Amino acid sequence: MRSSIDVHNHLLAEDVVHELSQLAGPLRDLSTAPGVLGLPPVAVGRPTLLADEDGAVVVLAPADAEVDTAGVAELLGRDRLDPVPPDRAPGLTGYLLAFVPPVALECPSTLVVDERVASQDVVYAAAGEPGVILKVRGADLVKATSAVVAPVTRQAS
């Protein structure tokens, strides 16, 4: 399994200024991070992992939003993209499903960032393990990863 050290080393190699913060306790997933950290949901990019025969797609969406998976597949022209089940995520990415980071995956991957998250000065995202969070400038993350930025979410009801 990979860890936040892999995320840190990847971002260092790309000259991306970032912070990894140890949390007081582990999060179940990033949907609870805004309340724990005192942040608006749009500042926390919660990962959704999709995959097809061409590799993985990590979608960062506001913590309170649902990803439009069909919309992401259409946006990327990859109609066979499907959500990755929790038991398959570690073998594919090297990380537990709820904590898949935006970088340093073991497989080929594309990063898609919802435009509301990408527009934030600072984005908080999974760092690869339950008790650690990644803090990075939204523009730096998009630039370093050549992320696709688009409106790919719908508000959770």
Named regions from a protein language model:
Residues 1-157:
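Extended, low-hydrophobicity, polar/charged segments
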